[in-house]
Every structure is written in C-alpha cells, then in structure tokens.
Amino acid sequence: MPDHLDPAPDALRPRWTRALEGSRSPGGPDPTPYADNLLTRWQEPQRRYHTLTHLTAVLDHIDVLEKHADTPDLVRLAAWFHDAVYLPNRSENEERSAHLAERALPEAGLTAPDTAEVARLVRLTVTHAPADDDRNGQVLCDADLAILAAPAPAYADYTKAVREEYAFVPAEAFREGRAAILRQLLDLPRLFRTPYGEREWEQRARENLRTELTQLGSAPG
C-alpha cells in the first residue's frame, strides 16, 4: 500500500455536494446519503490504488483542467462514479459503475440527458480514447491518467499499489500483462488530449512509462 493515508471522507463530501448542486435544479434530495454510499465504496478493502487518494487526485486534476470541459461539474460527478465499482479480478467494473450512476443520479435530481452524459464518461474510462471534439471526455481521461506523469516517488507508489491490487496474479503473468499495457500506451500518438495535459504531462509520463518498462524487463518479480 502507498506510504500515506487516504484523505478523510469529510474533506471529500463537500466536493460531491458542490458538483451535484452545480448539475441539478435547486431543491433536490439531500446529497449526503449519495456521497456516503460512494465514499464507502471507495474505501473497500480490496483497493490499493483505486482509493480515496486516487479519487481526490482525479478531482484535483479536473479542477486544473475545468476550462477545457463543456460541463465540468458533470465531469466531476463522472470522476466520483468512474471506479465506484471496483474488483481487480473482474473486467466489467466500468460498466457496473456506469449502471450505478444511471440508477443513483436521476434519484439525486439530475436530468436524463445529464445522467446519460455522466454514464457515457464513466464508460469512456475503459479505453481513455475520447473523440477530438469530446471536451468533457478529454478532461476526465486526462485527469484519470495524470498519475502517469507523477514525480518518480509518487509513480513508484502507484506501480506498487497496482501490483498489490493484482496480488492474485503470478509474477511472470503480471509482468507480461503490465508490459503489454505500457507498450500500448507508449504507442499512442498522444497520452493526453487537453492542451494543458499535452504540454505539462506528456513528456514526463512517457519517461515514467519507459522507465517502468525497463524495470519490468529486469526485475525478478
């Protein structure tokens, strides 16, 4: 597990409320139960990387990138839901997270079109491949991938936490699978789609990916 504590849920609850209130008409249901349900999910014991620390980082990065989004509060809601369902040994986490958003958000007061947009954004995190005119998608995907551009110690914490989430995978199989993912990322013409992400994160992210790929080739497991 990374050598730091996750943020306190109380620090995140107001951020949920602001995003929800910014996306719905006044007078909707109390936001707190919805926040508490999501916060409980983000603190499940099987998580090592996909924790409140990751959620906070994605929200912080959306704050940096918000001018590039069409509806930044919907992007923030998508961040809350994008890993709300997370089991490392399952492949349908994003789809199940999108379904959760489709059930919860209309009850919380969002319109059908806005709910559909949040669910679409959640599903986009399967590929992290937003269209050139998908400003909301570009912001969410860049915010989610920004960890790739972290300073070396934080990136090392990230890779350690990912390995811990996949502790059930044998070392050799993990190395092969992780290396394939890193090569796929390095083969992309652009990791980041917003002007800010491309300018500030692209080069450092590629350096981190190349370093990890080299380490995977020589590490014993």
Question: How should these model regions be labeled?
Answer:
Residues 58, 73-88, 97, 122-126:
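His-Asp-centered metal-binding catalytic motifs of divalent-metal-dependent phosphohydrolases/nucleases
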Residues 13, 17, 32-36, 59, ...:
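An amphipathic alpha-helix signature
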Residues 44-54, 86-98, 112:
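Active-site metal-coordination segments of metallo-dependent hydrolases
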Residues 41, 97-131, 183-185:
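Histidine- and acidic-residue-rich, metal-dependent catalytic cores
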Residues 31-39, 52, 72, 76, ...:
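Short, well-structured alpha-helical segments
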Residues 68-74, 90-93, 110-114:
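Short, flexible active-site-proximal loops enriched in glycine and acidic residues
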Residues 1-25, 43-50, 61-71, 81, ...:
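Divalent metal-dependent phosphate-bond-processing catalytic cores, especially two-metal-ion Mg2+/Mn2+ enzymes
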